[in-house]
Swiss-Prot record:
Enzyme Commission number(s) of this protein: 1.17.7.3
Native organism: Geobacillus kaustophilus (strain HTA426)
Alphabetized PANTHER family for the sequence: 4-HYDROXY-3-METHYLBUT-2-EN-1-YL DIPHOSPHATE SYNTHASE (PTHR30454), 4-HYDROXY-3-METHYLBUT-2-EN-1-YL DIPHOSPHATE SYNTHASE (FERREDOXIN), CHLOROPLASTIC (PTHR30454:SF0)
Protein encoded by which gene: ispG
UniProt protein name: 4-hydroxy-3-methylbut-2-en-1-yl diphosphate synthase (flavodoxin)
Cofactor section: [4Fe-4S] cluster
Length: 374
C-alpha cells in the first residue's frame, strides 16, 4: 500500500452530461431509499439529494414496476440517473429504453451470452455506460473456492472476469467498483485495481453502518483511497437519510481539496477563553454554507486574540470576544460587530463572497467563449 497512484490517465467515460475519469473531478453519487415505482417519493428524494450536492443518483430496479417508472423519474430530475440491476437482463433493457444514463449490472450474472449481447447492444446504441459492481460479500463461488475467503486478488479477478465479457463484445464504456465493508480489504482491492486496468473507479465502503460509525469508517477508508489518487466517483454508504451520505462525501472531498464547488468551515475546539456560544454559532454557519456551491473557506473562532491569525487562510470569518466579534477577510480585521449581530453579518459577507465567485466564473466563461469564437 505504498506509493501515490495518479489517475490522470484514467479512461474518460460519459455519464449523461458528465465525464467520469480522465482528469475530471471526483463526482459524488448517492442512492435513493424509496420504492422506485413510487415516482413522487423517489423524485422528491432526488430533488433533496440534488440540493445537497449529489451529482449522480442510483435507483434500485428490482422489478417491472421500477423499470416502468424510469422515464417519468428521468424527466423530472436534473442529474444523471443510474439503474441498479441484478440478474434480469430484461430490466436492464427496459431501463436503457427508459432513458437511464448508466446501468449497474454484472454481465457474468445475467445468463446466456445472447442476453449479455442484447444489453451491450442497447447500451451502445444509447451511449449508456455499464458499472461493474464487485462486492466482497457476493463474490462468485469459483473465486471463493480458489482463495478460501474474500481477498483483494479475488475481487480484482472478479472485476476482470466481467470486464473481459464486455471487452469481447467491443464495449469499453465501463466503470468499476470493488466494495467491501472491511476497510483494509477495500483499500487493498482498489489499489490493486488501479494498477491492473485504467477504467474509472467508483469508490465506496459498503455496509459502513449508522450515521456516526459509518461516517468514521467511510472517512478512514475513502480518505486512504483518495489520498493515493484513486477514485473517480464516490459514494458514502450509510444506514441514514441519503442526504447525509452526500454531506459526508462532500466533507471528505473538501478535506483533500477535491471539491471545487463546496464551502468549508473552520472552527476552533473551544476552551476556557471562549466568551460566546461558539458551538451553536459554528453549527448554524455549517448548516448555512452546506448548500453554497462555491469554494469559500469560512472561519468561526472563539478567541479575538488568536482568531484572525489562526484563520489567515480563511476567506471570511468571525472571532468572538465578550459582547462583540471581529469580522475579518483573509486574516485582516474588517470591523467589529455586536455579538447579537455576528451570525447575520457573517452570513451577509458569505453571500457577497459567493456572488463575487459566481460573477467571476461567469466572466471567465464569457471570455473563453469569446476567445473560442475568434
Amino acid at each position: 500500500m505504498g506509493e501515490i497512484i495518479h489517475r490522470s490517465k484514467t479512461r474518460p467515460v460519459r455519464v449523461g452530461p458528465l465525464t467520469i475519469g480522465g482528469s475530471n473531478e471526483v463526482i459524488i453519487q448517492s442512492m435513493t431509499t424509496t420504492k422506485t415505482h413510487d415516482v413522487e417519493a423517489t423524485v422528491a428524494q432526488i430533488h433533496r439529494l440534488e440540493e445537497a450536492g449529489c451529482q449522480i443518483v442510483r435507483v434500485a430496479c428490482p422489478d417491472e414496476r421500477a423499470a416502468e417508472a424510469i422515464p417519468e423519474i428521468k424527466k423530472r430530475i436534473n442529474i444523471p440517473l443510474v439503474a441498479d440491476i441484478h440478474f434480469d437482463y430484461k430490466l436492464a433493457l427496459k431501463a436503457i429504453e427508459g432513458g437511464v444514463d448508466k446501468i449497474r449490472i454484472n454481465p457474468g450474472n445475467i445468463g446466456r451470452r445472447e442476453k449479455v449481447e442484447a444489453v451491450v447492444k442497447a447500451a451502445k446504441e444509447r451511449g449508456v455506460p455499464i458499472r461493474i459492481g464487485v462486492n466482497a460479500g457476493s463474490l462468485e463461488k469459483r473465486i471463493l473456492e480458489k482463495y478460501g475467503y474474500p481477498t483483494a486478488d479475488g475481487m480484482v479477478e472478479s472485476a476482470l472476469y466481467h470486464i473481459r465479457i464486455l471487452e469481447e463484445l467491443d464495449f469499453h464504456d465501463i466503470i468499476v467498483s470493488l466494495k467491501a465493508s472491511d476497510v483494509r480489504l477495500a483499500i487493498e482491492a482498489y489499489e490493486k485495481a488501479a494498477r491492473t486496468f485504467d477504467y474509472p473507479l467508483h469508490v465506496g465502503i459498503t455496509e459502513a453502518g449508522t450515521l456516526f460509525s459509518g461516517t468514521i469508517k467511510s472517512a478512514v477508508g475513502l480518505g486512504a483511497i483518495l489520498s493515493k489518487g484513486i477514485g473517480n466517483t464516490i459514494r458514502v454508504s450509510l444506514s441514514a437519510d441519503p442526504v447525509e451520505e452526500v454531506k459526508v462525501a462532500r466533507e471528505i472531498l473538501k478535506t483533500f481539496g477535491l471539491a471545487s464547488n463546496a464551502a468549508t468551515l473552520i472552527s476552533c475546539p473551544t476552551c476556557g477563553r471562549i466568551e460566546i456560544d461558539l458551538i451553536r454559532i459554528a453549527n448554524e454557519i455549517e448548516d448555512y454554507i452546506a448548500k453554497i456551491q462555491a469554494p469559500i473557506k469560512v472561519a468561526v473562532l472563539g478567541c479575538a486574540v488568536n482568531g484572525p491569525g489562526e484563520a489567515r487562510e480563511a476567506d471570511i470569518g468571525i472571532a468572538g470576544a465578550r459582547g462583540e466579534g471581529l469580522l475579518f477577510r483573509h486574516g485582516k480585521i474588517v470591523r467589529k460587530v455586536p455579538e447579537e449581530q455576528m451570525v447575520e453579518e457573517l452570513k451577509k459577507e458569505i453571500d457577497k463572497l459567493a456572488e463575487e465567485y459566481f460573477a467571476k466564473q461567469k466572466e471567465n466563461k464569457a471570455a473563453l467563449k469569446g476567445s473560442a469564437a475568434q
